[in-house]
UniProtKB/Swiss-Prot annotation:
Belongs to the eukaryotic ribosomal protein eL33 family. The gene is Rpl35a. GO terms for biological process: cytoplasmic translation; ribosomal large subunit biogenesis; rRNA processing; translation at postsynapse; translation at presynapse. SUPFAM superfamilies: Translation proteins (SSF50447). Keywords: Acetylation, Cytoplasm, Ribonucleoprotein, Ribosomal protein. The modification N6-succinyllysine is found at K63. The modification N6-acetyllysine is found at K8, K63. This is Large ribosomal subunit protein eL33. It is found in: Cytoplasm. Coiled coil: none annotated. Pfam families: Ribosomal_L35Ae (PF01247). Component of the large ribosomal subunit. The ribosome is a large ribonucleoprotein complex responsible for the synthesis of proteins in the cell. Required for the proliferation and viability of hematopoietic cells. Component of the large ribosomal subunit.
Amino acid sequence: MSGRLWCKAIFAGYKRGLRNQREHTALLKIEGVYARDETEFYLGKRCAYVYKAKNNTVTPGGKPNKTRVIWGKVTRAHGNSGMVRAKFRSNLPAKAIGHRIRVMLYPSRI
């Protein structure tokens, strides 16, 4: 079986009010999701921000490489247009705004 076990999303920014932004919650726009009821499937799914850094790090069961991951979880819907909120283990860096996030198709709730 080949194919990816994740769908594409864009990190749109942080949860915010008019004057304050809360960096502990990220807003994600999932590709192909345009209504609030369509986000129901993605709630509880794991998400990952994959990026490359300057130095190698040891990967379990593999060679050291420059790839790193920040893991998170989709927590709830945001608005009526298919955006979702996600919490990551460490807050996403601001340079990640506009970049790709992987929303994994697990754990399954079906």
